[in-house]
């Protein structure tokens, strides 16, 4: 039988600092419930399973690292670590994705933009883009195509345990992709300056 740890979903899981885009970086205290919910509700839609190969692209100081590690380990997927040199956008990243047969990755738009549009990454079946706004041009290149890839625009502040909304991108849609709908078991609220 499993030993009781005394932990509850309300207990602190980790503290991570925000980017400071609204002024000064601050420590976001994240509870177990947030990252567990993210993993529990996203493994299925992202088609993560034993045999999947998740790239650990984000620095440990960035919230996406928690997503990469948690989702890979809780789904039975392999988590692929690499040196910062091998993760450099462009030729090094292409080589890593190809040679390691990466099937799942969360990359910022700037990293995708550095990969030539004619690059074939046949093993990369699920690609999330986050950390900045995704453009229509990136969607046209990376969604579906000959490799039948799902491209998902992920959005959310650090305080939301990595991301709060997702949108599966349609390569035939016009304009930048929306931020999408809330992930399962969550709600979002659109507020004005008065709250």
Each language-model region and where it sits:
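Motif- and composition-driven signal specific to adenylation
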Residues: 1-195
């Amino acid at each position: 039988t499993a030993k009781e740890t005394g932990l509850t979903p309300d207990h602190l899981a980790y503290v991570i600092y925000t980017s400071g885009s609204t002024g000064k970086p601050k420590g976001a205290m994240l509870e177990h419930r947030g990252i567990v919910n993210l993993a529990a509700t996203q493994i299925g839609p992202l088609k993560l399973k034993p045999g999947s190969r998740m790239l650990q692209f984000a620095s440990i100081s960035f919230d996406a690292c928690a997503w990469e590690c948690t989702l890979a380990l809780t789904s039975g997927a392999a988590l692929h670590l690499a040196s910062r040199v091998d993760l450099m956008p462009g030729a090094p990243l292409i080589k890593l994705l190809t040679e390691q047969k990466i099937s799942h990755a969360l990359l910022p738009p700037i990293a995708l933009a550095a990969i030539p549009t004619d690059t074939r990454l046949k093993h990369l079946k699920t690609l999330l883009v986050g950390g900045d706004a995704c453009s229509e041009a990136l969607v046209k290149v990376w969604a579906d195509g000959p490799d039948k890839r799902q491209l998902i625009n992920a959005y959310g502040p650090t305080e939301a345990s990595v991301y709060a909304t997702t949108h599966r991108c349609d390569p035939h849609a016009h304009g930048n992709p929306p931020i999408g709908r809330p992930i399962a078991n969550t709600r979002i609220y659109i507020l004005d300056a008065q709250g």
